[in-house]
């Protein structure tokens, strides 16, 4: 079904352009298509493989969903996939270049070399021949390509940018949430004072308990705690490892929908990690073990409101740990002192 939706989207999105292209065939000399009839052949495609210098990724159409095979069949980021398919459908061979293989390196069209091009292969339709994607042209929009079985180089009229790294194709959304959906926030990090943030009568974020003699740096100092959660972006995934979460910090977001999200964060040698748990109000996330939270996450309350908030599926939340950017990690681990105005004699920490 999703494959059909993707095709319908391509048809509607390119309808005007296709009509213009067809009219131009009668007004200008015809140019060859990179893949004639590509859109009509798309329903038979069951997967794409992109490889470069020993690295490679398989995007597979599995049970109605495009997934990344090298990442445990995690959903694909539709945006770059849609763009790539759109460009391949539009691509024309506008200029014939060299047919001498000795010049392939200069155009980024070698295979199995450190400066090689990306090889794109289709699964499910043998008429869509593998193509090597090289450098982009410097004088006009376009990309040098050649079919894998042919030394002849062509310039096409599309600027193709593709990646053979599996992590680059993962659906990046983690949480779709805004300030007004949050009722309160509680941060608890190792070695730091636990604190809770709530709204005051003017709807500003304030500390539930301000340390005696201290004030916030400025009135809206706590606002980033509410906005950060909607700006989280997934960089990669790994199978859930309980050992990764020993001593991890947590940020608990109580939502106006009565759901509660516990965002656990951990720093490791390979990067910064996030674990998202949907738990019930009976469990105190700061006291519960990861095993307890994981059980609660298997069957959280089902609600359209919660489904709109969560990027990953419920199963993915239980199965995976999510790698995030350092800035996201830092934002979810701000100490209480970070938000307070320095005391007399203290230097201001920007």
Residues of each region from the PLM?
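A short-motif feature that recognizes glycine-rich, charge-decorated loops
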Residues: 1-350
